[in-house]
């Protein structure tokens, strides 16, 4: 009985950013990504709809590892098509620990820095053909999950 009581008293639930901070975090992420594009004289991206990206971020928050496949085994392109979108899509994923909105902003900056060090992720960020980025974000359990779906939209 003592073990159960001590476990209850000392169980640790990490702080997480409030889900209401997600819109501001998405705006921040778009600015960080566009800052990288500007450094390389590439047109800034516009904000995408983020429906598929948000769903994937929420799914990934419940998983132990990052994956481009959703709970039904769909790839980013398939999820994008199921959402009624057309065109090319490429996806970058990241997860970082953060306990509040400011720490999550730092995590976003670090995630984009890491992506710029990875050849495929960097190519997605700097691809001049890309026109939009749909940013999915989920916070909980002391972490932020980021899904960046880079899109080529022809209007």
Indicate residue ranges for each PLM-predicted region.
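A well-ordered secondary-structure block
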Residues: 75-154
């Amino acid at each position: 009985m003592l073990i159960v009581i001590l476990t209850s008293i000392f169980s640790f639930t990490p702080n997480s950013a409030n889900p209401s901070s997600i819109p501001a975090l998405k705006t921040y992420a778009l600015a960080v990504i566009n800052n990288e594009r500007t450094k390389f004289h590439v047109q800034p991206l516009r904000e995408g709809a983020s429906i598929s990206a948000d769903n994937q971020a929420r799914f990934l928050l419940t998983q132990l590892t990052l994956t481009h496949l959703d709970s039904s085994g769909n790839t980013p392109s398939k999820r994008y098509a199921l959402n009624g979108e057309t065109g090319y899509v490429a996806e970058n994923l990241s997860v970082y620990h953060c306990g509040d909105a400011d720490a999550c902003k730092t995590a976003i900056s670090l995630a984009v820095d890491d992506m710029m060090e990875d050849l495929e992720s960097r190519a997605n960020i700097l691809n001049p053909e890309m026109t939009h980025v749909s940013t999915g974000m989920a916070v909980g359990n002391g972490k932020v999950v980021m899904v960046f779906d880079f899109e080529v939209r022809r209007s």
